Amino acid sequence: MLRILDITAPDINNGNGIRVTLWVAGCTHHCKGCHNQWTWKYDQGKIFNEHKDEIYSKLSDWLSRDYVEGLTFSGGDPLCQDIDGINSEMEIVEWVRKNFPTKNIWLFCGDYYNDLPENSIKKTLCNMCDVIVEGPYEEDKRDIAHCPFRGSTNQNILYINKK
């Protein structure tokens, strides 16, 4: 089940332009030096299926603004969710595509895109997004000065769908 920790906006740290960031609960990577350790636990936040109206209302309020470029999934890790959680994230992506077709969608994850099984639900979610920031944070490769939107040099920005 997907749990939402927070929705932050306006946000300029988690993708190009001014964005809305959806923070999901839960991560199994537990990267040493992680900036978002507060998001690791799965038993915190609002259960998406029980708070959909509230979550969609807040997202709509921000995504309807012309100056907001899109939505970012962060956390935690959007890919470190059970099947129900991934399905909920896919529902959110489909909702954004339907209601705000000009907005782009970024997703941060600790996995490498090419390591995901081709027909997996995780890869399907990634393919629904426009930009993936992939790879675990590696403290010994920290270089925030030269890695926009990333914390370490092993992380990559992949443009999956151009918007």
Give a label for each model feature.
Residues 1, 102, 128-129, 154:
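A generic structural signal for alpha->beta connector loops
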Residues 13, 114, 141:
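Flexible, glycine-rich phosphate/dinucleotide-binding loops
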Residues 85-93, 97, 142-163:
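P-loop/Walker A phosphate-binding loop and immediately adjacent motor/lid segment at beta-alpha junctions
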Residues 3-30:
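N-terminal pre-triad scaffold of radical SAM enzymes
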Residues 56-60, 64, 118-141:
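Structural recognition of alpha->loop->beta junctions
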Residues 2-7, 18, 36-107, 113-120:
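Conserved Radical SAM active-site core
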